[in-house]
């Protein structure tokens, strides 16, 4: 959240991202998550809303996407994959953040006239194939299947293979799985080389 709030895309440092998600003792079990419920409460913004902002309301219908929605969806997936693939204990999704729920949560209180209007989650959004929410939901299911279906995944170390903050790329390996991330907002790479274990 801090990186998204305080830095433009061009200033994101992959080495810092990897450090933040792996900064723990090897034997220390943790619960990893991209955002806490605090971001979903009224007065703050979720990751997806910080990335896409009001375009979530106007350009989340299939065929009507724009650059902001496509970028936000891609970054949301990458942030969640990085967080989930570096776990050492557990991964937490909650209250619709796995599919980019568009609204905040506001429980009945004096300040909102004791309204229940935003004390809900619209689970139907992820099932509507005419909207982009299902892209995030489908990705989340595939990601969880990969991590959960990989034998002894959490017993493997996160081994950094490469990072280049100038290119905004990094790679790490867990067992037989190799994860490569390009966080550059302006550059794609072909035949990008880095060292891996023999046989990878």
Question: What name fits each language-model region?
Answer:
Residues 187-200:
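Beta-strand-rich binding/interaction modules
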Residues 1-110, 116, 148, 152-190:
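Conserved alpha/beta catalytic core and glycan-binding cleft of carbohydrate-active enzymes
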Residues 119-160, 198:
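Aromatic- and carboxylate-lined catalytic core of secreted/periplasmic carbohydrate-active enzymes
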């Amino acid at each position: 959240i801090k990186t998204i709030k305080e830095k433009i895309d061009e200033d994101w440092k992959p080495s810092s991202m990897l450090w933040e998600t792996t900064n723990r003792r090897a034997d220390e079990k943790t619960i990893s998550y991209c955002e806490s419920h605090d971001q979903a409460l009224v007065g703050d913004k979720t990751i997806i809303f910080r990335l896409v902002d009001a375009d979530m309301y106007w350009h989340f219908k299939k065929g009507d996407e724009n650059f902001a929605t496509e970028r936000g969806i891609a970054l949301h997936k990458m942030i969640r994959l990085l967080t989930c693939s570096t776990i050492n204990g557990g991964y937490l999704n909650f209250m619709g953040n796995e599919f980019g729920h568009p609204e905040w949560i506001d429980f009945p209180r004096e300040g909102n006239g004791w309204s229940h209007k935003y004390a809900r989650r619209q689970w139907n959004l992820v099932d509507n194939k005419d909207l982009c929410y299902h892209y995030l939901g489908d990705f989340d299911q595939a990601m969880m299947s990969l991590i959960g279906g990989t034998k002894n995944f959490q017993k493997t170390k996160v081994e950094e293979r490469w990072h280049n903050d100038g290119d905004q790329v990094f790679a790490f390996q867990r067992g037989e799985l190799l994860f490569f991330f390009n966080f550059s907002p302006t550059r794609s790479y072909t035949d990008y080389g880095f060292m891996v274990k023999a046989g990878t």
